[in-house]
Amino acid sequence: MNLITTIITITITLSAVLATISFWLPQISPDAEKLSPYECGFDPLGSARLPFSLRFFLIAILFLLFDLEIALLLPLPWGDQLNTPALTLVWSTAVLALLTLGLIYEWTQGGLEWAE
């Protein structure tokens, strides 16, 4: 227990010291070269901000939903060892049906189309 306390104390102290140094060092000698963006030795050609596609964001959200579905269905084989394996099958089928209906709805609304 004493070893864990020592390690946590050292970690917190070292993190605080490094964070303080990282904020303090750039303020010692600021100049234009340090404050400008670096593009392989060339002057920046354009804005660093690019427009973000909303469709990409929607597809990323759909991916996260289906990834979460897989995480929910992974323990399904162990559900057979419960007292009521039929109930486990019913709930997993309900989750799959709900997500399939959501995917069909998104598809029919055109949310998965890249071209407008």
Curated annotation (Swiss-Prot):
Keywords: Electron transport, Membrane, Mitochondrion, NAD, Respiratory chain, Translocase, Transmembrane, Transmembrane helix, Transport, Ubiquinone. It comes from the Eukaryota. GO terms for molecular function: NADH dehydrogenase (ubiquinone) activity. It comes from Oncorhynchus masou (Cherry salmon). Belongs to the complex I subunit 3 family. This is NADH-ubiquinone oxidoreductase chain 3. Pfam families: Oxidored_q4 (PF00507). It is an enzyme of class 7 (translocase). The lineage of its organism: Eukaryota, Metazoa, Chordata, Craniata, Vertebrata. It is found in: Mitochondrion membrane. It is a multi-pass membrane protein. It catalyses: a ubiquinone + NADH + 5 H(+)(in) = a ubiquinol + NAD(+) + 4 H(+)(out). Its EC number is 7.1.1.2.
